[in-house]
């Protein structure tokens, strides 16, 4: 691949000049705790046949297995390995020398999401408790920019996101878990009824309702930035249910495809929207039983991945990186795609220049 150098010329408002960009809207999607091993390699054959983790190995093999790694991963993530592969970029396949890492040492959710959105791996962010985040996040920064105020929306399954993004200070609309959908939209009213009446086998709003709430909000209110945060992959992994972990990952890929196709059919979004897909942390693999887990004591749980697709992102497919990339680079990348320069409260973090022309 060719190395792209991006030169930023800044002025006081944080906007960029000297760079032509086409992205006017941004969609961000996270799959909580989704391992890079399945994203780039498909179903793990060792876990597949382990009856402790996979109840119906024959069914999973029929749906997702192939002797070919390329076929396996495409069966599991057809959108990533068709549209994104052909038109965008994927980072994190360590088998080809593409490394993406957590910069934070904790390797679990709140520190990971903090790093994604603030660009700073804060050592004070070291629990998953509902503590208001003191760090300024990139969505909060963009909410203050002309044309973006009140045009940012977040829909999450996990109910800690209002604290991670500090919605009370940032002014960002964040709808999480059991939050009501009090909008004048018949479809959103229906989703409100459905999510209030449905069973909650994982103790959280099912990802499908998080998705449809976000999609219907986009159709009704046309935000400039939409973030959808899925959670089921992490929950099923912790439960040791590999088959359900795979089913959720496959379903979330389909939801991402549906959302991308939806915006490509809308004139205000088509050819003006960039999609970023990533995760908050990885999981264990060197010790196979640790696929369920993550955290500071699991060496390889900080290995993550990024996918990007949009009008300012070259069609490179799998990208080999000369140097490791870090999760903290996503916040300035998000801003740069929209023509702004975001500086973390502390530390220095540069955008992923290859995602941007």
Task: Label the model's feature ranges.
Residues 19-89:
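Active-site-proximal N-terminal segment of extracellular/periplasmic enzymes that hydrolyze or transfer
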Residues 167-169, 215-258:
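Active-site His/acidic residue clusters
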Residues 64-161:
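Long, well-ordered early-domain segments
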Residues 50, 278-309:
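Histidine-centered active-site microenvironments of extracellular/periplasmic hydrolases
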Residues 1-22:
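Bacterial Sec-dependent N-terminal signal peptides
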């Amino acid at each position: 691949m060719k190395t792209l150098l991006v030169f930023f010329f800044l002025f006081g408002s944080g906007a960029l000049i000297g760079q032509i960009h086409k992205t006017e809207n941004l969609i961000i999607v996270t799959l909580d705790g989704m391992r890079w091993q399945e994203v780039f390699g498909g179903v793990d054959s060792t876990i597949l046949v382990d009856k402790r983790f996979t109840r119906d190995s024959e069914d999973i093999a029929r749906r997702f297995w192939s002797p070919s790694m390329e076929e396996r991963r495409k069966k599991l993530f057809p959108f990533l390995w068709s549209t994104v592969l052909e038109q965008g970029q994927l980072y994190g396949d360590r088998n080809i020398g593409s490394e993406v890492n957590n910069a934070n040492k904790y390797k679990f959710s709140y520190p990971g999401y903090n790093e994604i959105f603030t660009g700073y791996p804060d050592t004070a962010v070291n629990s998953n408790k509902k503590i208001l985040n003191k760090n300024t996040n990139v969505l909060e920064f963009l909410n203050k920019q002309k044309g973006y105020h009140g045009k940012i929306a977040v829909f999450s399954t996990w109910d800690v996101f209002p604290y991670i993004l500090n919605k009370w200070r940032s002014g960002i609309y964040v709808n999480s878990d059991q939050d009501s959908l009090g909008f004048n939209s018949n479809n959103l009213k229906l989703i409100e009824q459905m999510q209030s009446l449905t069973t909650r086998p994982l103790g959280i709003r099912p990802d499908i309702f998080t998705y449809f709430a976000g999609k219907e909000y986009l159709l009704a209110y046309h935000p400039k930035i939409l973030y959808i945060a899925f959670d089921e992959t992490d929950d099923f992994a912790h439960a040791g249910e590999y088959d359900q972990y795979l089913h959720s990952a496959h379903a979330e890929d389909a939801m991402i495809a549906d959302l991308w196709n939806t915006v490509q059919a809308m004139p205000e979004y088509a050819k003006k929207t960039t999609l970023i897909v990533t995760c908050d942390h990885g999981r264990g693999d060197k010790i196979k039983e640790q696929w369920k887990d993550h955290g500071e004591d699991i060496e390889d749980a900080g290995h993550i991945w990024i996918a990007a697709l949009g009008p300012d992102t070259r069609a490179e497919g799998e990208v080999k990186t000369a140097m490791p990339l870090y999760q903290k680079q996503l916040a300035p990348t998000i801003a740069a795609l929209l023509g702004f320069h975001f500086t973390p409260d502390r530390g220095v973090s540069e955008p992923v220049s290859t995602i941007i022309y």
